[in-house]
Design a protein with these regions (language model features):
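Short alpha-helical elements
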Residues: 1-279
Length: 279
């Protein structure tokens, strides 16, 4: 979508100061989804500047109070973060970007098969819900991720690390079915085994569950498994966001917003590069 001077004045798109700043091509992907400024009261800080500040924080993991001075005051950015978090903006942006990315790959906008996995992550002294993952020996929280066969995120949830993968499967697939009722099958690893848990997940979502097991139990460490490597790759992409190297948040709601924001940032970059290459 070409930009004109009115667009540039509206969103105050200027020359990027940091590599995380949004470009015109990236902004065009999500501009229609950004909330319109209120007509009354003081003029709010430009949404693009807030986006740049948040994406900088995701990549560099700086605390709120250490936000560089060429961004707005950290309280301004923080208040907008909470407002967008509470409105569900990032989940909406991720959903739209995933549909656009699938169509750019020549696929239908909605998937029919998904892959499920989890990632346990340590927390800090910030407090909030947490638990101990006995299998991975990690005290903190667990990120549950559902992706399509391209590795694009369909659903993500966060729980205490003590929640077993199989116990999180039913609410995950139920959310997937509510969002994308065309999904008919899912692929999971051995951590999701359990007849009772799988029956509950199928009853909640009508999505079939296939467990993909390791064929060589003698080999320790990571092994690429057919049908499951795409979700491992997506989890690897998330690790580029240093803000997500640990869970610094006091609430799961904020932790989920940062995760969704990181996914949106990755999708924006991917789509913008694809469009530039085709131009």
């Amino acid at each position: 979508m070409p930009w004109n001077e009115a667009d540039r004045m509206k969103y105050d798109v200027i020359r990027a100061r940091y590599s995380t700043d949004v470009s015109e091509a990236e902004l065009a992907l999500i501009a229609p989804l950004l909330p319109a400024p209120k007509r009354r009261g003081r003029r709010p800080t430009n949404a693009v500047i807030i986006l740049n500040a948040l994406f900088y924080m995701i990549r560099c993991a700086c605390p709120w109070r250490l936000l560089p001075k060429d961004f707005p005051p950290f309280t301004t950015v923080q208040n907008r973060f909470y407002a967008w978090r509470d409105s569900g903006l990032w989940a909406q942006i991720v959903d739209v970007l995933v549909m656009n990315a699938r169509e750019a790959e020549g696929r239908e906008a909605a998937p029919t098969a998904v892959v499920v996995d989890s990632q346990s992550i340590k927390t800090t002294e910030a407090g909030g819900p947490r638990g101990f993952d006995a299998g991975k020996k990690i005290k903190g929280r667990k990120r549950h991720l559902v992706v399509d066969t391209l590795g694009l995120p369909i659903e993500c949830q966060i729980t205490a690390a003590s929640v077993q993968d199989r116990d999180a499967l039913a609410p995950l697939l139920k959310a997937v079915h509510r969002k994308s009722p065309w999904v008919k099958m899912s692929f999971v690893d051995g951590g999701y085994q359990g007849d009772e848990a799988q029956r509950a997940a199928f009853a909640a979502s009508r999505i079939s569950i296939t467990v993909v097991k390791r064929t060589d139990t003698q080999i320790k460490g990571f092994i690429v498994l057919p049908k499951r490597w795409v979700v491992e790759r997506t989890l690897g992409w998330i690790n580029r966001a240093r803000r997500l190297s640990k869970d610094f948040e006091a609430t799961i709601k904020s932790a989920l917003a940062w995760l969704q924001m990181a996914l949106a940032f990755l999708l924006m970059r991917r789509l913008a590069r694809s469009q530039t290459a085709q131009a």
